[in-house]
Swiss-Prot record:
Transmembrane portions of the chain: none
Species annotation: Salmonella typhimurium (strain LT2 / SGSC1412 / ATCC 700720)
NCBIfam families: PRK10509.1
Full protein name: Bacterioferritin-associated ferredoxin
Pfam families: Fer2_BFD
Length: 64
């Protein structure tokens, strides 16, 4: 599903970037993929996808 229509960023691309780069903030994620830098309507959904993927990662499950 497309999250950012302006830049053609899908939830899969966000999840892939989270797994590869382990960003700890949305600003860090934006260094790796161009999400939320045009109209900004996708920021909330992109953050939700990022947080969901972070909580699915094994190293974060052990901490929780």
């Amino acid at each position: 599903m497309y999250v950012c229509l302006c830049n053609g960023i899908s939830d899969k691309k966000i999840r892939q970037a989270v797994r590869q780069f382990h960003p700890q903030s949305f600003q860090q994620l934006r260094k790796f993929i161009p999400v939320g830098n045009q109209c900004g309507k996708c920021i909330r959904a992109a953050r939700e996808v990022m947080q969901d993927e972070l909580t699915q990662m094994p190293e974060f499950k052990e901490i929780a």
